[in-house]
């Protein structure tokens, strides 16, 4: 299994357990799902209509996004202006890291990042933003949106802003 960790904070952001697609040469998108967590209701596959006393009562469960929950991502908020301020600083920091490690990737990163940021800004109200567990303000912000069907959530992380750790 490969864990994708933030190059600045070391926070775990995603793993290859999710179906990951590369977009614009700079983004990894992974579909995720809303899942129930908590409570002590264990589904053993029995038909609930044949069981007595099976009421739909609050049992301490909550519905969460599986990626957000699994990697303990923390919600954060932006308006367009603050997002643009953040993303400019973040892109500059990633570019500096690339200069050290992989200067040949800089043109691809700059071009692809510009295209993807325009997509995000174009549909800004539809996006949700999360930080890693450490909530490091200089680290990557994980972006979450929904596919065209309106029900399938996906997360987006910057390919050049992660280290891959094989475990």
UniProtKB/Swiss-Prot annotation:
* One example of a Gene Ontology biological process annotation: cytoplasmic translation
KW Secreted (keyword) present: no
- Answer yes or no on keyword Protein biosynthesis: yes
Query: Which segments constitute the TCTP domain?
Result: 1-167
Q: Which UniProt keywords apply?
A: Cytoplasm, Cytoskeleton, Microtubule, Protein biosynthesis
| Origin superkingdom | Eukaryota
PROSITE patterns documented for this protein: TCTP_1 (PS01002), TCTP_2 (PS01003), TCTP_3 (PS51797)
Transmembrane segment boundaries: none
Compartment annotation: Cytoplasm, Cytoskeleton
In terms of InterPro entries, this protein maps to: Mss4-like_sf (IPR011057), Mss4/transl-control_tumour (IPR011323), TCTP (IPR034737), Translation_control_tumour_CS (IPR018103), Translational_control_tumour_p (IPR018105)
Q: Which GO terms describe its molecular function?
A: calcium ion binding
Q: Name one GO cellular component term.
A: cytosol
To which protein family does this belong?
A: Belongs to the TCTP family.
Query: What is the annotated role of this protein in its UniProt record?
Result: Involved in protein synthesis. Involved in microtubule stabilization.
Q: What protein does this entry describe?
A: Translationally-controlled tumor protein homolog
């Amino acid at each position: 299994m490969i864990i994708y960790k933030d190059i600045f904070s070391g926070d775990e952001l995603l793993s290859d357990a999710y179906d990951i697609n590369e977009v614009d040469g700079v983004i990894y998108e992974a579909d995720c799902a809303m899942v129930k967590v908590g409570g002590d209701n264990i589904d053993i596959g029995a038909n609930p209509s044949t069981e007595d006393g099976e009421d739909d009562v609050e049992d301490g469960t909550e519905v969460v996004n599986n990626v957000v929950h699994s990697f303990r991502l923390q919600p954060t908020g932006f308006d367009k202006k603050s997002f643009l301020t953040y993303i400019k600083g973040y892109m500059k920091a990633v570019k500096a890291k690339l200069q050290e490690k992989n200067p040949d990737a800089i043109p691809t990163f700059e071009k692809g990042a510009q295209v993807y940021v325009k997509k995000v800004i174009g549909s800004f109200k539809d996006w949700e933003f999360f930080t890693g567990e450490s909530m490091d303000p200089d680290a990557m912000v994980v972006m979450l949106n929904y596919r065209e069907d309106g029900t399938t959530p996906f997360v987006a992380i910057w390919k050049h802003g992660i280290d891959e750790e094989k475990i």
